[in-house]
Amino acid sequence: MAHESNETRQNLIKATSELMDLHAIEDISASMILERAGASKSSMYHFFEDFGDLLDETYVVRFGENVRVSIVVIEKIIARSTTKEEFFVALDRLTASTQDRGLASLRFSRARELARSERNEKFQKSLGKLQQQLTDSLTSAFQTAQDKGFLNKDFEARTGAVFIQAYTLGRIVDDITENQMNDADWQKLIGRIAREVLG
């Protein structure tokens, strides 16, 4: 019985997440989620305080999935790099993928999650724990890179961890403009900052 209950809860979150990929958040209704999940209205209110609580939980799950992927990617780069040049070449490839213009929707999603937490203490705490986990993991990874001589020790590893996240999300300011910057030039600038300031 407990397994069935948990499955229903997960189905509601999964259905909500799938709809978030297809529709603007304001266009998603509880009835759309219930139909997609094959669940009843009473089951939704059994697991969640209200519709907003279900949305919050789904945002947290999606955020957590992105956090785990980000941690694995950066840890692999540092573990597999044997020289400083190998490290920065791998970092260049990562920059090219994370800064891809086609990932604008992902940046907008992250911005919505952060904005949603401003006046929602419960959601902010849940999101904050995951964000802390990401920053802590990146900090540890940066410390390893510093110990291996890939990055200099003139800055604290945590500062570097926050910096790399900031410019990744910061691309969003160009996503909404009509006259957009040159992608290659942007990636070149990031690579230069990484090598000349962080390296």
Pin down the residues of each PLM region:
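Short loop-to-helix capping motifs
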Residues: 50, 116-121
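Amphipathic alpha-helical packing segments from all-alpha helical-bundle domains
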Residues: 67-68, 72, 100-111, 119-148, ...
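C-terminal alpha-helix
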Residues: 19, 141, 192-199
